[in-house]
Structures are given as structure tokens and as C-alpha cells.
């Protein structure tokens, strides 16, 4: 049973281990209870940095989590207050995000989607029975208990959850994540439990086709779509979805919350409770591919937001996220060939799934091509799709006609946005330094590589098998034993480089990397990876401080 203690020090009962995640005022670390050797995840909140309102939110989160005991909810086991810190001890869930697990499966069907939403609805029904509304149901908060096949889906993060009075509706403030907000919240009407069902409808839609029902780069237009309930079931991807699945989505995405299906009713829907006979068993490969792109886009947005926090630590007065379009970057003079494709009108030509492992070969005279805005053809989600908002002072809306891209992250002291000209020059600079880094890798030139990278470079890459790698030793092994010893030709193409300028001294670039190489049998091959790099400028010099790459383990393509 979860208990609150103010006299017992956390370290008396638990031993802390590695960091699992980090927020603005908190860090999550693995811990072990000394008396039982049971593993948990400890959310450690620095209460010295919290406002009075934040303290109230922390108390609310702990109070709510203590109520909830369900196999599909991440459980709170302990709540300990100390001088300056508060510790929330939760289940240690090791399976990662549900959506990431789905794209790694060899087989995924409508019946699997039904099983997923069944577990999500079980968790939602449980919290609603306890008069709790989550308010932030989204893929990032749907985790798997373990990496074992068939592991339970667990609902996490009750930081925005509220306590309600039965079915009573009230205005609890503007809170949630843009793509998952309900019409009543956007209208600033009284709301309650039905907002969670609306979010479940959005999640179910994504589970079936891999993209969301409402999406637009402009947050104002996105909100107009949601308030109008303007979604459809386009061909051909929806042609293979059963009518029963569409019926459940329609009942979840009903504009009028009073007529929206409840969690208990949804659990009794034939598509959920009789999935073995009602839901289709056909493998949905297109859904998996679309979902992989959707996941990559979510991760990019998360990386940008994290980098903004890091940038504010470097220079609190310079934290401004520039989200202007990258189309129109002109051809530059550099050591590599640069070819620009015509700009497409596609709003999400950002990332694409990896098809083959990274090649083992490098070249004596590598070439790098940069291609901007190549057509991708995948339906996209809003730029703000994974950014959680809470504003109980009723200031959550974007003013009429104003894009979400015009908004900035909160900061103690922000400077005016850089001019369009200087921003474009900065973006060209980031693309060029990224190109030089890739050339250093293709040349097997570790010395040049180290001059462009921060000594404490952190990275998530396939070769590290999902682990966070810090420092240069891991990369040095590949340079010494593989990259520098190969002489076969290689050509790298950087597709759709998207640069986000973060203040004066930080930037993030995301791109698709195509590598043409000759395999061991002398045949030409092409591999693909999606990569994100975070750059920080120190003493006038750009250094790569973080790197994230998709794909299967092979040779590193840092």
C-alpha cells in the first residue's frame, strides 16, 4: 500500500541506480528496496524549485496515484517527502512504449489493435470508477510492463489528472496535448470523464492506420478540425477495416460529450469483447509503416523540447524555438555535391522507416548529397502533437489566426526571434556541419570526427542495442576496426533536412540518410536511417552533443 512519510529518509529504504528519464523539475531513476530487493522507478522532484501551485499539483498527483490499483495502470508504491525533495516510487516498467513495440512486431492486425484498446479502456474505466480524469491520454503514456510477448499495457503519468464529482461537468482548465484534446475543452465548456474517451478514439484511429484523425501544421486549424469533428475514413487504408471498428471510433469521437460512449460501454462493444470473431486478423503492413513514421515524428518533437531545456541551462536568455519552414534553402558551396529537389506541399516529409541494416563499407572519396523536401506521401500530425499543455488560468488557446509555430516555450527571459535571414543562414550552417561530420565517418577519419563532436556526446543508436552511450570510446572501436580499413565506394544522400534553431547557440537537425554502397559480393546496395542531431556552439564552434538513429544493428553511421 502506498504511504506518505515525512520523517523517513528515502535513502534509508531504497538504493538508487541509473537515470531512466528527466523532466524540468524531476528525474526518474531505477531504485531497489533494500528489504526486498524489489526494483522500482523513483520519480525524484526537486521541491525547492516548485511554486505553490506546483506543490499543489504534486500533492494531487500523489493523492490520485495512491487510489489506483489496476494491472493496466503504473502503480504508486511509496510517496516520501524530504527537505527539498519528494520521492514517488512507481512500478518499474521495462517494455517501453506500446507504439514502439507495435512497429517491431512481425505481425499486427486489427485484432491486435482491439486487444490494445481493450487494455487501455480497462485502465480508463478503473480511473473513472474512482472519479478520476486523466486528461493526457496519448501514446507517450501507454507503456508495456516488460519486453515479454503479450506484456500488459500500462497507463502512466497522472501529472494532469484531476478529481471530479461523479458525472458532473465543470471547467478544470485548459490541459492536455493538442492532437488529443476534445471539442469541449477547446470550446472551454465544462468537461469531465468523456474527454478521456475522446482521446481513446484518437488513439484507436492511430492504432488502425498509423496516422491521427486530426492533423495540421497550424494549431488553430487543428483545433477547428477537432471542434467540428472533421475526420473521415479515407481509401484505401480504411477499406480493409471492419465496420464494427469504425462504429466504435464514431461513438468515441462524438462531438457531444453527453452522447459519447463511456469506458464501460466501450468495453462491451462487440469489436472489443468479441474480437476473435468480429475483428479482422489480416496483417496490416501499411499501418506498421505509417506508425513507424508517426513515432519518429513524435520523437523528433520530444528531442527538440528536451534540447530547449538544455539550451536554457546554457543560456537562459536565449531559449527560443524557431519553427519556420526550411523550404527554400539555397545551394551552398562545400566539399560535397548538393542537389535540391523541388519543394513539395507535403506537410510531413520528414522521416521514413529504415528498410535495411546500415552498410559495413566506407569510401576513399565519399560523396554527400542534400535533398530538401522530397515527397513522402504519409499523412502527418500537427507540429505540436506531443506537447502537453496545462493552463488553469484559461490562457491555453492560440489567438485567432495565429499558428502554434509562433508560440515559444516559457522562459525566464526570452530574446526576440532571430531575423528570417539570419535564421536561414544558421540552418545552412547546421546542414553543412552535419554533412562534414558524415564525411568524416565515411572517410574513417576519427580525428576529424572528434573535432566536430563533444567529448561527452550522448547517443541512441542501433549498435548500442537501445542503451544510451556517452563519450567517444564506443565510436572509436568502429573507426579503428572497420571504417578506416575499407576502401569501397560509398555515397550518402541527406533527404529533407529539417533544422530547428534554438536560441543563438543551439540547434537540432532531423533528416533521412540514404547510403549507397557495394556489398561483399560487389553488388550496389542502398540502406536508410532516420537521424536526429543536437548541436551546441561553444567558443564559436559547433559541436554535436547528442545523436539519435533508427535502424537495425550493423555498423554505426554516426
Curated annotation (Swiss-Prot):
It is found in: Sarcoplasmic reticulum membrane. Transmembrane segments: none annotated. Residues 394-408 have a biased composition (Basic and acidic residues). The modification Phosphothreonine is found at residues 287, 306-307. Residues 342-352 have a biased composition (Polar residues). Residues 14-272 form the Protein kinase domain. Belongs to the protein kinase superfamily. CAMK Ser/Thr protein kinase family. CaMK subfamily. CAMK2 is composed of 4 different chains: alpha (CAMK2A), beta (CAMK2B), gamma (CAMK2G), and delta (CAMK2D). The different isoforms assemble into homo- or heteromultimeric holoenzymes composed of 12 subunits with two hexameric rings stacked one on top of the other. This is Calcium/calmodulin-dependent protein kinase type II subunit gamma. It comes from Homo sapiens (Human). The gene is CAMK2G.
Amino acid at each position: 500500500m502506498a504511504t506518505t512519510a515525512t520523517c523517513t529518509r528515502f535513502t534509508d529504504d531504497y538504493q538508487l541506480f541509473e537515470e531512466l528519464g528527466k523532466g524540468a523539475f524531476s528525474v526518474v531513476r531505477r531504485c531497489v528496496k533494500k528489504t526486498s530487493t524489489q526494483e522500482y522507478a523513483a520519480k525524484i522532484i526537486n521541491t525547492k524549485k516548485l511554486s505553490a501551485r506546483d506543490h499543489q499539483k504534486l500533492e494531487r498527483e500523489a493523492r490520485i496515484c495512491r487510489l489506483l490499483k489496476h494491472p493496466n495502470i503504473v502503480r504508486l508504491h511509496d510517496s516520501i517527502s524530504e527537505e527539498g525533495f519528494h520521492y514517488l516510487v512507481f512500478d518499474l516498467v521495462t517494455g517501453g512504449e506500446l507504439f514502439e513495440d507495435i512497429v517491431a512486431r512481425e505481425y499486427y492486425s486489427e485484432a491486435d489493435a482491439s486487444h490494445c484498446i481493450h487494455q487501455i479502456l480497462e485502465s480508463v474505466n478503473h480511473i473513472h470508477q474512482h472519479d478520476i480524469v486523466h486528461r493526457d491520454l496519448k501514446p507517450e503514456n501507454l507503456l508495456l510492463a516488460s519486453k515479454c510477448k503479450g506484456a500488459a499495457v500500462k497507463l502512466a503519468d497522472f501529472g494532469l489528472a484531476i478529481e471530479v464529482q461523479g458525472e458532473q461537468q465543470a471547467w478544470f482548465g485548459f490541459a492536455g496535448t493538442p492532437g488529443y484534446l476534445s471539442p469541449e475543452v477547446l470550446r472551454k465548456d465544462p468537461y469531465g470523464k468523456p474527454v478521456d474517451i475522446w482521446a481513446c478514439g484518437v488513439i484507436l484511429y492511430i492504432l488502425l492506420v498509423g496516422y491521427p484523425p486530426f492533423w495540421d501544421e497550424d494549431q488553430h486549424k487543428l483545433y477547428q478540425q477537432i471542434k467540428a469533428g472533421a475526420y473521415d475514413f479515407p481509401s484505401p487504408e480504411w477499406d480493409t477495416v471492419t465496420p464494427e471498428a469504425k462504429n466504435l471510433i464514431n461513438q468515441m469521437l462524438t462531438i457531444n460529450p453527453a452522447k459519447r460512449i463511456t469506458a464501460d460501454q466501450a468495453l462491451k462493444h462487440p469489436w472489443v469483447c468479441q474480437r476473435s470473431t468480429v475483428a479482422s486478423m489480416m496483417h496490416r503492413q501499411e499501418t506498421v509503416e505509417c506508425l513507424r513514421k508517426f513515432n519518429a515524428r513524435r520523437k523528433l518533437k520530444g528531442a527538440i523540447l528536451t534540447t530547449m531545456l538544455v539550451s536554457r541551462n546554457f543560456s537562459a536568455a536565449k531559449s527560443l524555438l524557431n519553427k519556420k519552414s526550411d523550404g527554400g534553402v539555397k545551394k551552398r558551396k562545400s566539399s560535397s555535391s548538393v542537389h535540391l529537389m523541388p519543394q513539395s506541399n507535403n506537410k510531413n516529409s520528414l522521416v521514413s522507416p529504415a528498410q535495411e541494416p546500415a552498410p559495413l563499407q566506407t569510401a576513399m572519396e565519399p560523396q554527400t548529397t542534400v535533398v530538401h523536401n522530397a515527397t513522402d506521401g504519409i499523412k502527418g500530425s500537427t507540429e505540436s502533437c506531443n506537447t502537453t499543455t496545462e493552463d488553469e488560468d484559461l490562457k491555453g488557446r492560440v489567438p485567432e489566426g495565429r499558428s502554434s509555430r509562433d508560440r515559444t516555450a516559457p522562459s525566464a527571459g526570452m530574446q526576440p526571434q532571430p531575423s528570417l535571414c539570419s535564421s536561414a543562414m544558421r540552418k545552412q550552417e547546421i546542414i553543412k556541419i552535419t554533412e562534414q561530420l558524415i564525411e568524416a565517418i565515411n572517410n574513417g577519419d576519427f580525428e576529424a570526427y572528434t573535432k566536430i563532436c563533444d567529448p561527452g556526446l550522448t547517443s541512441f543508436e542501433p549498435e548500442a542495442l537501445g542503451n544510451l552511450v556517452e563519450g567517444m570510446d564506443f565510436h572509436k572501436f568502429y573507426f579503428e576496426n572497420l571504417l578506416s580499413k575499407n576502401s569501397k565506394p560509398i555515397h550518402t544522400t541527406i533527404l529533407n533536412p529539417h533544422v530547428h534553431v534554438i536560441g543563438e547557440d543551439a540547434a537540432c537537425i532531423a533528416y533521412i540518410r540514404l547510403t549507397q554502397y557495394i556489398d561483399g559480393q560487389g553488388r550496389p546496395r542502398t540502406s536508410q536511417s532516420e537521424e536526429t542531431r543536437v548541436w551546441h556552439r561553444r567558443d564559436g564552434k559547433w559541436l554535436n552533443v547528442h545523436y539519435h538513429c533508427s535502424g537495425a544493428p550493423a555498423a554505426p553511421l554516426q
